[in-house]
Amino acid sequence: MDQSLVPADSIWTWKQADGCSLEVAWQCHADTPEQGQNSSVPAVVLVHGFGASGNHWRHNLPVLGKRTRTYALDLIGFGGSSQPQALLAGEQPALGQADRSQSLVYSFDLWGQQVADFCKAVVQGPVVLVGNSIGGVVALRAAQLLEDHCKGVVLIDCAQRLMDDKQLATQPAWMAWIRPLLKALVSQRWLSTALFRNAARPRVIRSVLKQAYPSGNNIDDQLVELLYKPTQRPGAAEAFRGFINLFNDHLAPDLLDNLQQPVDLIWGQKDPWEPVSEAQEWEQRFSCVRSLKILTNAGHCPHDESPEVVNNELITILKKY
């Protein structure tokens, strides 16, 4: 396949070990023939954050694609990929939905395996994984699964996942009291759906973006639409339900502690949700972390808020391979 001509809505059928299949939407930019699958330059695979899609890399794909094959895929439950019904611990599939293509447990193992299998089946060569927010946790898990096929990871404002049970010691004491009630409530589909429908409105999306993008750069109608449109698909609320019920899953520090590949960090100093102090601690704590670039005027999604700066930093990192 000439991947320089791959349309934005390409679909890869992800065949599971149990025989079930899920559809994964993906796109690729590769401007020159020498960037084919036999190139010695690692390809780049971009992994989006919660509620986003591969389109969130709109300002990065074309630029990075001039250097090497660059891919962006939609995680299961998001964008144009399959959106199976979310199963929580102890739940059974509804009648007629035993097939994993219709109902499954959303998890970082699921998404990490998706990215790893995509790299092996579609990219077919060495890769560097770049992840934003929860996409960073996914990238770390995928790097573990890929082993030598993954040459390195770049984390952009990686998610801390403070609501995980393992983070309880870092939370206020009152959180331990209300936590059982909170977990019981958000497990209810009627409530998670109501919360999702409230959040999945253009006005609310724009309001959240103003927090995530403190400079206001690139908050435009295109951005709001690319985030809003996938929320109108029939199964969109299910990924939301699955994610907000992830109370015992992988944390980035645990993955970093067991990672063999080099990791570079890019962080917005004004991120309202993932403090830069955590990135600074990671730089000192984990031997796999080789660099930290702090962007003074950026927030949670600097790759879209300050794409020129992030693209230059990514190109500098890629030159190390």
Predicted regions and their residues:
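Serine-hydrolase catalytic-loop signature spanning alpha/beta hydrolases and amidase-signature enzymes
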Residues: 49-59, 70
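Active-site loop/oxyanion-hole signature of alpha/beta-hydrolase fold enzymes
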Residues: 10-20, 27-35, 71-130, 312
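Catalytic active-site module of serine/aspartate enzymes centered on a nucleophile-bearing elbow/loop
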Residues: 288-321
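Active-site glycine-rich loops that stabilize anionic/oxyanionic intermediates
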Residues: 41, 49-52, 133
